[in-house]
Amino acid sequence: MSITESIVNINGTLLKGDEAKISVFDRGFLLGDSVYEVTRTYESIPFLLKEHLDRLWRSAEQISLPISYSPEQIKVEIDKCIKELAIPNIYLRIIITRGSGEIGLDPDLSPTNNLVIIAKEQLEYPKWWYEQGVSFVVANTLRNPKNSLDPNTVSYT
């Protein structure tokens, strides 16, 4: 599925993927001031949606990003994407940005969030991966220091 076949929901407005636009003054674009969560559907049902939204809220709390949508409102917008795309297995990326405003480091310069939901066909791994298996390598990278941002925070910052 190409970008033109994807659906993007921006603050409740459904758009084709190649028509979706967000302001270059959005802090998510300018500063990475956003959080995101990724899940998928199985037979049009979002997988562990409550848990993913809980983690989205925890990530937002880690960067002091108040979310102006309720989990129920986000679920409604996800359902709109699922209905519009009308396929059973969908990749869902849920993004909350701090929003657009004056350029500056003060987060209060952006009073309203932007909610972006990207919905596209979930690409499946090749069948042989499941039948034959695949090889992976585990890196010897050390963990982040304890005083750094929680590595479970899902953000672009």
Residue ranges and their predicted role:
Residues 1-80, 102, 106-156:
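Helix-start/capping segments and mature chain N-termini
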Residues 82-86:
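Phosphate/pyrophosphate-binding loops at sites that engage ATP/ADP/AMP, CoA/4′-phosphopantetheine
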Residues 87-95:
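Ordered, amphipathic secondary-structure segments that act as subunit-interaction surfaces
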